[in-house]
Amino acid sequence: MRKIIVYIATSADGYIARKDGAVDWLDRPRPKGNYGMGEFWKSIDTILLGRKTYDFVVQFVKEGKSIPKQKHEPKHYAFSRRPPKKVLPGFDFVKEPIKKFAKRFRAQKGKNIFMMGGGGIIASFLDVGEIDEFIIHVIPTFIGEGIPLIAPRHRTVPLKLLSTKKFSDGVVRLHYEVVKTKAQARSR
C-alpha cells in the first residue's frame, strides 16, 4: 500500500516558514546529494499540498523562478474549499474529504505520496490518521517565530524513530513513522 510521507525542512525551533511565509533561511549552500532529495523524488509519483502552499508556488512562478523539472513529473493535488479560478498546469484541486481521498489514492497502484505542506494540511491529514511517515530536515537556524510544522491542535501523535542522519553542514534528518492507534489501523 502507498504511504503518505511528509518530507520537509524546519528551523531548529520547529518552523517551516516565517510568519509571512518567507523561507529565506533555507537559502544556504547544500552538501553534495542535496540531502537525499533525488532518491526521495524517485520514490513518489504524487504531491499533496494545502492552499497556502499552492499560493506560495504560484507566487514563486510569478517571480520568474522555475520549479525544478524531474525525470518523471508527479501529479499535484491541492486541497481547498475555495479553489482559484485559474490553476497552474499539472495541479488539480481537491474538495473531497481527506479520509475518502487518502483511502482512494492508497488503493491505486503507484509510488508513495509526498505531503509537501503546509502546517494546516499536514494537521488535517494527521487528524484523520492519514500520515504514515515524517522525514524532517532540521536546519541549524532559529527564526524566532513563524508557521509551525503542524498547525496547533489538542492531540498527541506518537512517533517511532526509524533513522537519523547528520549532514556536513549541520542539518540533521529525522525519519519517523507515525504510530497508528488500533482504531486508525482498522479504518484502512
Label the predicted regions.
Residues 1-188:
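Enzymes that bind and transform nitrogen-containing heteroaromatic metabolites
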